[in-house]
Amino acid sequence: LEKIEFIIPCYNNKYQLKNILYSLLNQSNPNWTAHVISDGEWVEYDDFKIDFERENLFEDKIKFSLIKGPNKDWGHTARNYGLEHATQDWVVMTGSDNYYMPDFVSEFLKNTTNNNFIFCNMVHNEAHYKHYQELKAELTVNNIDMSCFATKKENAQQLRLNKKSYQADWEFVEKYITLFPGGIKHINKILYVHN
């Protein structure tokens, strides 16, 4: 069975990190793993990791790593590290401030046949919005978020995120679909929330 690996950079945000991990633990399909990469040491990281492991909530689904940092590059160094060490068939490079609907993994894995890039719609919440806003994802600049798509691991590992660019999401997508055309599937459902 195919699995999705969530690559989750984090730094100094244990409450948000708990939210994304619980959203994964509540997936209706168990065929996923997560790799949490701390972008440098922070005061509560070790305690958070120990407490989470002690609770034994994840049954070997969640791995923790610490890299030298903070790199202050929107998590791109940590995502590149996670990508280099990915072990599952599919990867989702996300952020610790996000969370997923319970059927995200199920919907994505139903659509893997003959596809190598799968993406869904999302809800977006930023400080300047007064409310959550639905965004129908499109393969154009400013209309797709790193966390709403999954790619075949072996293809994604041939690319890297631009550490200096705020638009690394789109730059990655543009390179990916240019190098690996075809096999693109849009799931016209909201399965992801960017907080």
List the predicted regions and their residue ranges:
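Acidic donor-binding segment of Leloir-type glycosyltransferases
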Residues: L25-K68
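Short aromatic/hydrophobic "clamp" motif used to bind/position activated sugar donors
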Residues: V91
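Short, well-formed alpha-helical segments that are part of the catalytic scaffolds
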Residues: N13-N26
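Cell-envelope/extracellular polymer assembly enzymes that use nucleotide-activated donors
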Residues: K3-E5, S23, T33, E171
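Glycine-rich, basic loop-to-helix element that forms the pyrophosphate-binding segment
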Residues: G69-A86
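Conserved nucleotide-sugar donor-binding catalytic segment
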Residues: A137-N195
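The conserved acidic donor/metal-binding loop of glycosyltransferases
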Residues: G95-Y99
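Conserved donor NDP-sugar-binding/catalytic core segment of glycosyltransferases
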Residues: V105-H131
